[in-house]
Amino acid sequence: MALLDRTARSFLLTEIVSGMALTLKYFFKPKATINYPYEKNPISPRFKGEHALRRYANGEERCIACKLCEAVCPALAITIEAEPRADGSRRTTRYDIDMTKCIYCGLCEEACPVDAIVEGPNLEFATETREELMYNKDRLLANGDRWEPEIARRLELDAPYR
């Protein structure tokens, strides 16, 4: 009897027919993918993207050179140098992040007492050379200036969980 069943299945091509039926079933369903450059998925308020240094409303940079972010970084991607100012406060003279080392864990953002370093909403920061992935203070401040409204909104949404 098994020989007869096997012969009937191979003669009637039931496996091929069932495979084609499955293909036709999914062919007419809505697609699960998106057309990426033109369509984008919504991004979570907790998304960790490109780093940015923030400023206060008066234009002064927030970073107080406490170096907590440098100390907590597991990848050792952050380098900070600071000098005291005339008014007695400290400010950074050098703030570098090696984005090739960064693992986007967000520990630097959590450690910062003044919310100076944040991981912004930008996920499209591909470069052509490795040198472009070495972010200095000016580039980080420019990122902060560019994304400040979005960063402030996301920090406000995330405030109950911090």
Curated annotation (Swiss-Prot):
PROSITE patterns documented for this protein: 4FE4S_FER_1, 4FE4S_FER_2
* UniProt entry keywords in alphabetical sequence: 4Fe-4S, Cell inner membrane, Cell membrane, Iron, Iron-sulfur, Membrane, Metal-binding, NAD, Quinone, Repeat, Translocase, Ubiquinone
Where is it mostly found? Answer: membrane
Domain (4Fe-4S ferredoxin-type) ranges: 53-83, 93-122
State the family it belongs to. Belongs to the complex I 23 kDa subunit family.
- What function is annotated for this protein? NDH-1 shuttles electrons from NADH, via FMN and iron-sulfur (Fe-S) centers, to quinones in the respiratory chain. The immediate electron acceptor for the enzyme in this species is believed to be ubiquinone. Couples the redox reaction to proton translocation (for every two electrons transferred, four hydrogen ions are translocated across the cytoplasmic membrane), and thus conserves the redox energy in a proton gradient.
Cofactor stoichiometry and binding?
Answer: Binds 2 [4Fe-4S] clusters per subunit.
Subcellular compartments: Cell inner membrane
UniProt-annotated binding residues for [4Fe-4S] cluster 2: C73, C102, C105, C108
Where, in this chain's numbering, is [4Fe-4S] cluster 1 bound?
C63, C66, C69, C112
Recorded GO molecular functions are: 4 iron, 4 sulfur cluster binding; iron ion binding; NADH:ubiquinone reductase (non-electrogenic) activity; quinone binding
Name of the protein described by the UniProt record: NADH-quinone oxidoreductase subunit I
The GO biological-process annotations, alphabetized, read as:
aerobic respiration
Cofactor dependence is on: [4Fe-4S] cluster
GO CC terms, sorted: plasma membrane
